[in-house]
Amino acid sequence: PFDDAGNIIFTRTWTDASEPKVDNQGNEIRPSQVEVYKWQSTFCKDDMGYIINPYQFYFEAGENTITMEGVNEPMVLKKLTLAAIDDSVTYEEYLANCPGEGNSETNINYVQVVQGEDSTIRSESSLYAKYDKSAPNTQPYSVTNTILNYVGGETWCSAGQWIEWEFSVPEDGYYNITVKGRQNYARGSVSSRTVYIDGEIPFEEMEEISFEYENDWNNLTLADADGNPYKIYLTEGTHTIRLEATLGGSGILLEELEDSIYRLNQIYRKLLVYTGATPDQYRDYNIDQVYPEVMEAM
């Protein structure tokens, strides 16, 4: 139906093969990565990350045909689901749809720290746990020994890469989420992540959270423009949180730039056929008459 639908990516999932081992010097040894064979539910969406929301397909009433052609690597397909388009909700609409009971003393005082290196699954085998000895505010920390204490870094830079963690809450209620991170790779720029709770983006403000350039580790509480922390409603039990790299607000600009470069290359090739690689400077090629559409496009 459109060009981008010709390249739909289905990511594999990876996890640690075992707990980190410790050598006789007290240094942790990073475990190898193994693929997790599990069913995944995923939308058909832009693999380049220019657009966060899933693709929308138009179907006529009655019987339609969907054909999927394998391009690279084997996979097993269990089912296809066609669903009505759900418009993303704002934070205010999200709160209005959640239960109105206030928090109890238990979940007001509840704190659970999930270390970054303890991620459950991830989209690529390169997103393994690493160590940082330069910052004493990392946990765990050791000056002398190699201790795995973070995940991501320079390998977590491409749109669509994600890391997922499990956590639990003691009872139903509203909870705040704080992410400890550091973005010291792109000076003058930001790194953006999309937040998924239990596989879904709870509200549109979670489509992009930004980490500005900073040499130090900082705590970023997910909050609105005024600094008020977002209240996330969770039921008692185990949940997942996934952070997925995204281009954020620059995605649309990059897509337009790529499209402009593509069209300029088309114009260049057309002119190259007409004038040759070394145009005669003493000849008038009358391009405006031969290729009026090129002049209009430029």
PLM region spans:
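Extracytoplasmic
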Residues: 1-298
